[in-house]
Curated annotation (Swiss-Prot):
Localization: Secreted
Glycosylation sites: 47
Protein name as catalogued: Xyloglucan-specific endo-beta-1,4-glucanase A
Matches recorded under InterPro entries: ConA-like_dom_sf, GH11/12, GH12
GO biological process: cell wall organization; polysaccharide catabolic process
Alphabetically ordered keywords of this record: Carbohydrate metabolism, Cell wall biogenesis/degradation, Glycoprotein, Glycosidase, Hydrolase, Polysaccharide degradation, Secreted, Signal
Lineage: superkingdom: Eukaryota
Gene field: xgeA
Gene Ontology cellular component annotations, sorted alphabetically: extracellular region
Catalytic activity: xyloglucan + H2O = xyloglucan oligosaccharides
Family, as annotated: Belongs to the glycosyl hydrolase 12 (cellulase H) family.
Enzyme class: hydrolase
Annotated source species: Aspergillus niger
Amino acid sequence: MKVLALSALLSLASAASISRRSDFCGQWDTATAGDFILYNDLWGEDNASSGSQCTGVDSASGSEIAWHTSWSWEGGSSDVKSYANAALQFTGTQLSSISSIPSTWKWTYSGSDIVADVAYDMFLGSTADASSDEYEIMVWLAALGGAGPISSTGSTIATPTINGVTWDLYTGPNGDTTVYSFVAQSTTEDFSGDLNDFFTYLVDNEGVSDSLYLTTLEAGTEPFTGSDAELKVSEYSVSIE
């Protein structure tokens, strides 16, 4: 029985290893890796005249993951096609009880005529359930090829310096959700900082309540158009403390 059990465990470990390193290309395909779910998330693919995208895990352990996504999209130049992302799995947590959200993110992008962002995407709601979301907070490490955030006016409302980076802050509605987007003034391919500092800024300066719950924390890329593109995340980590 011990031999059989060990054999079964080795078989499962081998299968898991292969699964983690196999790219997936379906619209809603996912892979669980460490503390994350990695999503292909081709939610806007119908806005493209042609294209495809595949995503895969390179390595993962606990709160650290390395991954990549490759895509080509044509048509619908003003529309996002997808949001391949690594989503941290956690229970919704009230902002007032969070002391820090340390994160590191090292990435590179290659391809032709890329219009895309590289961004954290986080949601705040009145309860720990994501269905109560009222705010979407995006932190753009890059706005490539003229990509731009949701904005009511097209103008910045502030230019704060947070975690040693100067950001253009925009706001606007997305349905019933208010979106705040911090867009780095220069592309930041090697980020290390405390994501809680963005929430502290919004609480102190934009009237966001610290009684709200952080319900979602994702990091990935939103492509508009481009060809033979690849986002390669060599290092990503995040935790809520």
